[in-house]
């Protein structure tokens, strides 16, 4: 995934979840749309180097999207729309391996309802298997350990529980985390942030739901899927924000 018209700037402040003010290389303060409603406190620090996509001449309230932040010489993409695009492309081109799928994917559809939830991807294989994939972006990291979530998520908890039900009805089920940064050796659930979500993941894995993590090679203007990363619920994550 490549971004066009990328400009480097420096983060000033984020008055709400959707808006941030940044200082560009011309010395101008610009208003930007933050493409991620998560907290991102460990990333969006005053003076942090950020990547902005310039989108001029539109009816938007801002002419820029804030898509990436540099932390300790590593770029973190924070575009919340990106993981789904990377996921479907990676699944279809074989970069992402989904365990237990025994033949080629012959049909897929996005945003499919099951029960009271809408899952990101629905798949059917040539041998008749049916699968749901729920995709989550991951941007929280400390000491090369990635964690989800960076804020409590009722929707995420609901998805995990619905996937358990789908698996019990015969679907192959997957939770796919796209870590929007490169340098991590393990991923986990942030139990301190949301204990009930960690419990739900334990039940889900015991029920047969597969949890998969892929990291990405990230620059200020490009994001490329890289490789599978181990997921372990027993890994202790130290939140840099707490």
Curated annotation (Swiss-Prot):
Coiled-coil regions listed in the entry: none
Top-level division of the source organism's lineage: Bacteria
Example GO molecular function: DNA binding
CDD domains reported for this sequence: SfsA-like_bacterial (cd22359)
InterPro entries, A to Z: SfsA, SfsA_C, SfsA_N
Pfam families: SfsA, SfsA_N
Similarity comment: Belongs to the SfsA family.
Protein name: Sugar fermentation stimulation protein homolog
Name of the gene encoding the protein in the UniProt record: sfsA
